[in-house]
Amino acid sequence: MKIAVIGAGVTGLAAAARIASQGHEVTIFEKNNNVGGRMNQLKKDGFTFDMGPTIVMMPDVYKDVFTACGKNYEDYIELRQLRYIYDVYFDHDDRITVPTDLAELQQMLESIEPGSTHGFMSFLTDVYKKYEIARRYFLERTYRKPSDFYNMTSLVQGAKLKTLNHADQLIEHYIDNEKIQKLLAFQTLYIGIDPKRGPSLYSIIPMIEMMFGVHFIKGGMYGMAQGLAQLNKDLGVNIELNAEIEQIIIDPKFKRADAIKVNGDIRKFDKILCTADFPSVAESLMPDFAPIKKYPPHKIADLDYSCSAFLMYIGIDIDVTDQVRLHNVIFSDDFRGNIEEIFEGRLSYDPSIYVYVPAVADKSLAPEGKTGIYVLMPTPELKTGSGIDWSDEALTQQIKEIIYRKLATIEVFEDIKSHIVSETIFTPNDFEQTYHAKFGSAFGLMPTLAQSNYYRPQNVSRDYKDLYFAGASTHPGAGVPIVLTSAKITVDEMIKDIEQGV
């Protein structure tokens, strides 16, 4: 069969490879001039920067894409586990290194607060049990009809997850120390949600980091995009770049998706899998006479969106890779207040920031004697933060100064401004324009309880035959391992339909 995949982000690349490995003819259409989507790369002034995700968790999910296609993952990506997850800075003189080794982890916890290990390990045990339930009964399956969700098994297993509790509540149940609470709460920002709003299930992120470890891909995270692109090439997939989809064509008589309009041409296909940002697809790519019924264009703005981010890609003329960790977090003096600012639409003058120094793990990513630095500051998305004008150069300059002051928390960056030889910024406006991310959301639809599982946009269209959806705003959600899972379960449903002649 001829299959179209819309979008060459990590979801689209993984999905296309899985389909092609089953013997089908696959074409990927990508609006930009490179693959990767939000897993993007910037090469500038001799530096190589990942532009989006940077932390490799759940490496088995990465490997599975290749092995499921009959290939050896080691022929495409080079993975290695990190001994330390990150350095966390509470203040200039207050740094904690978070290890993956259990004995070192216990030593770290006891140095923060004697006796805290028991509560911490109880938290990890509880969250691991919830993760296993969620993975088996909710995350790794689709919901094609109401009875797939509304049944006794889902009711019983869902009750065990205690999804009405928020991430903060679960953490505070086991942990009294405020520093340790912060160590477990900030990761909900990896998927763009407030820990006070995110279901307690999203506490799985620190559990996954500490129990399964954090890895690095040679070449940076973009190495995964390149590996997937090569996998597709080896499987005979055709990738068309600079190919922006104008419309998904619906046959009104048979209510099926049978073509796409791309760069003015109508291209016919047997099935279409769309991995582009779902809200933008529902708003702009469906014909007026054939909207997605649950998500018509006029309702898209009313959905809840994850936060956005202000990113800086900085090159400096000194090599500091032996004085800083690969992954670093610098907390705001008022962590909770900063979270409120992000989700209430206000800019912070004392933000928590994430700092990634890739040459610590791969010297090829910066010129000899120099260092590239990636900084992420969570911000409101463009709906909640409608009063923020990201095109205002005075404003972005002010934010850069805030970030440079915050970076000075790390001793080696105290005089960073005098060493800058390259600087690039990426704002919420850029998320919207580059990736068609609705409201510049960095992680798609916010995974609130009302926008999760059965209540999230589904992988198999309920309105039109031969139309499928995958990606961060669809089930099961955002984050690289999760969108890779989205690709897998969606393709499984498509192949099942093909085999059954549906």
UniProtKB/Swiss-Prot annotation:
A GO MF term: 4,4'-diapophytoene desaturase (4,4'-diaponeurosporene-forming)
Gene that encodes it: crtN
InterPro entries (UniProt xref): Amino_oxidase, Carotenoid/retinoid_OxRdtase, FAD/NAD-bd_sf
Pathway: Carotenoid biosynthesis; staphyloxanthin biosynthesis; staphyloxanthin from farnesyl diphosphate: step 2/5
Family from the record: Belongs to the carotenoid/retinoid oxidoreductase family. CrtN subfamily.
Role noted for this protein: Involved in the biosynthesis of the yellow-orange carotenoid staphyloxanthin, which plays a role in the virulence via its protective function against oxidative stress. Catalyzes three successive dehydrogenation reactions that lead to the introduction of three double bonds into 4,4'-diapophytoene (dehydrosqualene), with 4,4'-diapophytofluene and 4,4'-diapo-zeta-carotene as intermediates, and 4,4'-diaponeurosporene (the major deep-yellow pigment in staphylococci strains) as the end product.
EC number: 1.3.8.-
UniProt KW keywords: Carotenoid biosynthesis, FAD, Flavoprotein, Oxidoreductase, Virulence
GO biological process annotation, one example: carotenoid biosynthetic process
Name under which the protein is recorded: 4,4'-diapophytoene desaturase (4,4'-diaponeurosporene-forming)
Catalyzed chemical reaction(s): 15-cis-4,4'-diapophytoene + 3 FAD + 3 H(+) = all-trans-4,4'-diaponeurosporene + 3 FADH2
Pfam families assigned to the protein according to its UniProt record, in alphabetical order: Amino_oxidase
Annotated positions binding FAD: 5-17
The organism of origin for this protein: Staphylococcus aureus (strain MSSA476)
Enzyme class: oxidoreductase
Source species taxonomy: Bacteria, Bacillati, Bacillota, Bacilli, Bacillales
